[in-house]
Amino acid sequence: MLMPFEIMETIKMIQEENLDIRTITMGISLRDCASSNSKETRDKIYNKITRLAANLVKVGEDIEKEFGIPIVNKRISVTPISLVAESSDEENYIKFAETLDKAADAVGVNFIGGFSALVQKGYTIGDRRLIASIPEALSSTKKVCSSVNVASTKAGINMDAVREMGHVIKKAAELSADSGGLACAKLVVFANVPEDNPFMAGAFHGVGEPECVINVGVSGPGVVKSALEKVRGADFETVSETIKKTAFKITRMGQLVAREASRRLGVAFGIVDLSLAPTPTIGDSVAHILEEMGLEKCGTHGTTAALALLNDAVKKGGTMASSSVGGLSGAFIPVSEDAGMIDAVKAGALSIEKLEAMTCVCSVGLDMIVVPGDTSEETISAIIADEAAIGVINNKTTAVRIIPAPGKKVGDIVEFGGLLGSGPVMKVSNFSSRDFINRGGRIPAPLNSLRN
């Protein structure tokens, strides 16, 4: 039986503490669309997406109205296009990206993910074609998102792919220079990528997934901060317990929406992603949660420990609320999308090096990092390599979403707008990693990959 105080608590979470469902993401398998004729393949892709996702936006809006729960985004993820397009006669896959963009427009979703390649152990022909197409594909489309998995604990790190992604990111930034390198905000480089992630820009529909599935990503940093304000000065066991209870409530709401959406759309329910996803809105910041624990500024000594506590407690609370937890599930630390992170960078408290340490204990990695436009390809590749190493050795997902903003220098601010926010340009090392990156080859899998 629902108690009146629980109802009022939920209303307060939504109205005052920015609780929302960040995304309902429909995953669609395109494996049956592959053919040797590229136009036929693209027609099949468009028809299948528009058929299965025809009611996705309407159902999301109906649930939002009926339940009173804000649903910020409706999105689609598809089978990695490098797999679907590989048997076609196309030399580059830009037209496939345009087809995805057209389909996303037709059904009214915010983003579509899956312009992706999995190259942790090496390239196929389709992988090479897709990766070469990324800069132009992302700069010429509005809703298409791309991801490349360059490493895994089982395979090690494909350093040839790491090197190439440095070039791809620089090229994407140049082609979208008029928007501050916005194309790079739609590109993520992963290690140990999950196949059921509902969040962009890294979402794609894995080959082990069903024909069609609904995955939901929750949010709620403001709710967690508000809960911690009530136990200010208490010990860490109390802090952890408070976060766990709050994460339970947030996840329950996500599970409710996910099951209802899958029922109404007539497709399978997949997972709830527990990730605390911040926005540039004041009161919706992961950094402010860490500061509520007692840090003067996010990035000071103790930040990594505070984030580890937060991430662990969120998972413990969330897994008690749902038996279908997946995706990334933790705490996101995207600099440009988090008001507290932005302030910390401006104050000089938060550096790329500290963010890298934080990624050892949180959900993803170096996310929405803006660096000077003259940052070299090799430096970007080296940043990716460092992050991939953390993921591979620790058997966790890590990622890099980095924007070398054309014409910008350290201290400048780049405005992206919307959920992407604004990013202060951060300093990178002045010393070169060129000779290291140009070695190429593959960093072998670690000993802890042998688990049988």
Curated annotation (Swiss-Prot):
Pfam family, one: DUF711
CDD domains attached to this UniProt entry: RNR_PFL_like_DUF711
Binding partners and assembly: Homodimer.
Family of the protein in this entry: Belongs to the UPF0210 family.
Name of the molecule in the record: UPF0210 protein Cthe_0410
Organism of this sequence: Acetivibrio thermocellus (strain ATCC 27405 / DSM 1237 / JCM 9322 / NBRC 103400 / NCIMB 10682 / NRRL B-4536 / VPI 7372)
